[in-house]
Amino acid sequence: MRVEERLLKYVSYWTTSDEECRQIPSSERQFELGKVLEQELRDLGLEKVTLTDHCYVYGLLPATKGYADKPAVGFISHMDTAPDFSGKDVKPQIIPDYDGNDVLLKGSGAYLKISDFPTLKTLKGRTLITTDGTTLLGADDKAGVSEIMTAVEQIITEKIPHGDIWIGFTPDEEVGSGADLFDLDYFKAKFAYTVDGDYEGEVAYENFNAASASFEITGVNVHPGEAKDIMINAALVGCEIASLLPENETPAHTEGREGFYHLTDFSGDIAHAKVNYIVRDHDKATFEKRLDTLRGIEKKMNEKYHADTVKLNIQHSYSNMLEVIEKNEYVVAIAKKAIKNVGLEPVSRPVRGGTDGARLSFMGLLCPNLGTGGYGFHGPFEHISVEGMDTAVSVIKEIVKITAE
């Protein structure tokens, strides 16, 4: 099966994760794709194939005879799609020989614009896959899943010699818990790669430090005609909290290694309000200062109004894997060599996000991130080219060849 056929098949499954649910998987629907992948791995002849009760899929392609002493390598992608935008009833648009112009997304009437996504120019002449504008595409990370599955199939059919190859597909990466129950006692790779990036030829090993922060605000509600010096409007306190953070330190005003505070949602009324943020920074010390800023706001609000008006809850999400990877640079060197072998110059940028690999690297499994060839993730402008996916398949195969040398 061709890589694009797999992608179109996998995106037909609704696998949006649920950031409000603390169990794994956060949405039972992720099992539908998990069962499909489990069966496909079995059909390809892999061993130790399992779908766990928590929706992790594992499989082993055993080493070619005479190659059992070579390092075991793993490839990992996630099955869920981001809750930021609908992932239900995805209707991809397939555009052969893309002309390099803006693309009409026929379901919504919106346009995928070159002015917003300049990399579109580089995809001219390729087969482009987009959304119809009413959902995200799900290339993040079903493109990665497709590329791994296709690479495994080609390694088998082309009889490429290899050491042990472990495959892992996770739930709930998009809500920060994809690595929580990843079984490293079962998945016995020496090192691995997530296939969850964007740029073709990308190998990323520096990501954000990340946390979520929630302000719970309890107001005092009385009749507005008798409210003087009594009422505390929780919704207005929430607005005040937002105003105390620097307005130029948001995702819309930052790039590269610049961190941010991101207001993800705000709900409430006079009696109760909730303000949710995610906090990101590549530098660990600066990241901790950001969290201290939030704690300072909590203290200030409780001093201004009364104790327990505001309660802040901070949850750590993941750390910058650079801290671990820079001590084990061989995993990046292998990926860069593989990328050069397919005719590309490796791209390594600080990832303005996180991957399962960031968590796994701190758990003992070194795990940089490879590009899938997709762009515009988490929304209706998500797109990918067939040729970009083919390149990712080739990179995976080259990594396998290099580790078997």
Feature names for model-found ranges:
Residues 2-28, 129-130, 318, 378-379:
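N-terminal capping segment at the start of a domain
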Residues 10-11, 269-271, 346-400:
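Zn-dependent metallopeptidase/amidohydrolase metal-coordination segment
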Residues 19-20, 48, 161-164, 247-262, ...:
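Flexible, glycine/charged-enriched surface loops at secondary-structure junctions
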Residues 22-70, 74-76, 80, 91:
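A non-catalytic alpha/beta surface segment that caps or lines the substrate-entry region
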Residues 67-161, 391:
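Active-site metal-coordination/substrate-binding segment of hydrolases
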Residues 126-139, 171-295, 299, 308-310, ...:
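Midchain, well-structured core segments that form catalytic/ion-binding scaffolds
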Residues 153-175, 256:
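Short helix-loop-beta-strand segments that form the rim/entrance of peptidase-like active sites
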Residues 236-253, 260-262, 309, 319-368:
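Active-site-adjacent substrate-binding region
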